[in-house]
């Protein structure tokens, strides 16, 4: 009997093997059915509230939780000159500073009792207030949220704590070369006078008073400046009613914020060096960017992925790290600006003596993108990385609400409500000659601005095995940028050498 069963089993396995497809010799030869996915339709979730805001209401009964996010038309671009940091302070203390009826400590205690999380912040061009809590506690949570939005206390001791923490952070701005690089990147990318290049100083931080935060809040925190994203365990109609109540009868009028300034003035091509005694130099290679509505952006996105945005599949990473071992990480980014063109940046960190050589390799790869077509394999790899990962952008209801609210906030819904529906098709239509065409249009190695932060003397020596001179990579003079005082941002004067007059 046992022998008969074993024989039947062997026969079954053999027959099954004959009907199964053969296993390919390599993983990349595996074939899968085409991905069939449609992104959410924003019109299905969009609600124009009578109280002013547009809300994206996305029910999700999987867990007894609700997330409310409010996007606020505000930002550091509204900081008055001399009060840099005002927006950040206002956002940072909106929740942590208590309300008119609750001290900061009492509000924290109540939120903790509800196991709720409430947070607020204001960045460059966007404010955000969020609430996450159990659905059974939603009525009380929304009542607390309204208090925070309409009656923030900006408690004096919390303001002083924020001030001291900020001053301490400013004091450390030169401790790491990455923070120096970030500071100078803003100035080179947009110009010293552009609002995004202005940064807090000890003077501006010390000037901020509670009345300044209150005035900033009352000007911009009004329902007409809000876009709302809500997801979680609720009935749609009931949530809409709750939101109408949340934003009704606002106690102050507010103002419509002015347009975000776009008067950027990028630095002239050249090499810019900040001398910092560190063993490795940080390098950023910059070129003017594009707006997100540029019709060529799908091709630009794929081009950058092949050049340096695709990690270990990208050319810059392969040349600088894998082939030459000059950096742990190297790559590029080509973000599309919403309000003004963002900046193309290629960058890495390398030992001082190999900075020039590594920079020359990146410039070579930029030139090669424009001078010869990419391979079909490179193009298909880049396409797959975006197209196949696309559904992950919407794999939770919270993500759906958040993305759709941002589309509303930035105005894309009004211009192209079906943008995401056609996104993959636009990528898939890009051909090899499109990649080369946009590379020729946007990648100009002879016009780059190169920012280097590191030991200038060692960097300029170069490497004996690679006769590349940093100051010869661009036909423009090398400019020494001063290291700035971390508190005042004024140039630090060099210490006189021993034996010289002071």
Model-assigned labels for residue ranges:
Residues 96-102, 131-163, 310-311, 335-394, ...:
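M16/insulysin-pitrilysin zinc metalloprotease superfamily fold
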Residues 76, 284-288, 308-350, 403:
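A structural supersecondary motif
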Residues 27-48, 187-226, 258-263, 390, ...:
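Histidine-acidic residue clusters that define the catalytic metal-binding segment
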Residues 165-184, 262-281, 318-327, 372-425, ...:
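Short acidic/His-enriched helical or mixed secondary-structure segments at domain edges of catalytic enzymes
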Residues 20-30, 227-291, 452-495:
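An aromatic/glycine/proline-enriched structural segment found at the starts
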Residues 31-71:
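Mature N-terminal segment immediately following signal peptide/propeptide cleavage
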Residues 67-132, 175, 195-199, 310-326, ...:
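M16/MPP (pitrilysin/insulinase) zinc-metallopeptidase core fold and M16-derived inactive scaffolds
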């Amino acid at each position: 009997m046992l022998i008969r069963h074993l024989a039947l089993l062997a026969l079954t396995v053999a027959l099954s093997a004959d009907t199964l497809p053969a296993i390919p010799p390599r993983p990349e030869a595996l074939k899968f059915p085409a991905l069939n996915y449609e992104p959410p339709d924003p019109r299905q979730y969009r609600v124009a509230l009578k109280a002013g805001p547009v809300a994206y209401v996305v029910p999700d009964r999987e867990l007894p939780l609700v997330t409310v996010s409010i996007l606020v038309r505000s930002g550091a671009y509204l900081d008055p000159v001399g009060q840099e940091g005002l927006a950040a302070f206002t956002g940072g203390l909106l929740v942590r500073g208590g309300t008119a009826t609750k001290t900061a400590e009492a509000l924290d205690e109540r939120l903790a009792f509800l196991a709720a999380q409430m947070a607020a912040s204001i960045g460059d061009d966007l404010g955000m207030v969020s609430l996450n809590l159990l659905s059974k506690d939603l009525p009380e949570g929304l009542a607390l949220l309204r208090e925070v939005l309409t009656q923030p206390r900006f408690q004096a001791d919390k303001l002083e704590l924020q001030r001291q923490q900020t001053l301490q952070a400013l004091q450390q701005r030169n401790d790491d070369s990455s923070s120096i690089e970030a500071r100078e990147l803003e100035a080179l990318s947009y110009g010293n006078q552009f609002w995004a290049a202005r940064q807090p100083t000890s003077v501006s931080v010390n000037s901020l008073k509670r009345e300044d935060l209150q005035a900033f809040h009352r000007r911009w925190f009004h329902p007409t400046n809000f876009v709302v994203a809500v997801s979680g365990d609720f009935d749609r109609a009931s949530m809409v009613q709750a939101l109408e109540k949340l934003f009704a009868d606002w106690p102050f009028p507010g103002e419509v914020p002015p347009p975000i300034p776009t008067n950027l003035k990028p630095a002239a091509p050249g090499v810019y060096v900040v001398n910092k005694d560190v063993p490795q130099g940080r390098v950023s290679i910059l070129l003017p960017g594009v707006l997100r509505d540029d019709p060529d952006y799908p091709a630009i996105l794929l081009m950058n992925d092949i050049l340096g945005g695709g990690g270990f599949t990208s050319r810059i990473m392969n040349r600088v790290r894998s082939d030459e071992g000059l950096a742990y990480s190297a790559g590029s980014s080509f973000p599309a600006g919403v309000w003004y063109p963002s900046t193309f940046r290629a960058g890495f960190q390398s030992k001082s003596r190999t900075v020039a050589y590594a920079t020359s390799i990146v410039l070579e790869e930029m030139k090669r993108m424009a001078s010869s077509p990419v391979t079909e394999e490179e193009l298909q790899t880049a396409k797959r990385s975006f197209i196949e990962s696309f559904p992950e952008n919407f794999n939770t209801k919270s993500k759906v609400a958040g993305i759709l609210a941002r589309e509303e906030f930035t105005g894309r819904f009004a211009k192209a409500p079906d943008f995401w529906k056609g996104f993959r098709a636009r990528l898939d239509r890009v051909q090899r000659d499109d990649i080369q065409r946009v590379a020729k249009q946007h990648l100009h190695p002879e016009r780059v601005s190169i920012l280097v932060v590191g030991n200038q003397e060692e960097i300029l020596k170069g490497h004996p095995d690679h006769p590349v001179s940093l100051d010869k990579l661009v036909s423009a003079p090398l400019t020494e940028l001063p290291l700035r005082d971390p508190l005042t941002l004024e140039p630090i004067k060099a210490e006189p050498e021993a034996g010289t007059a002071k």
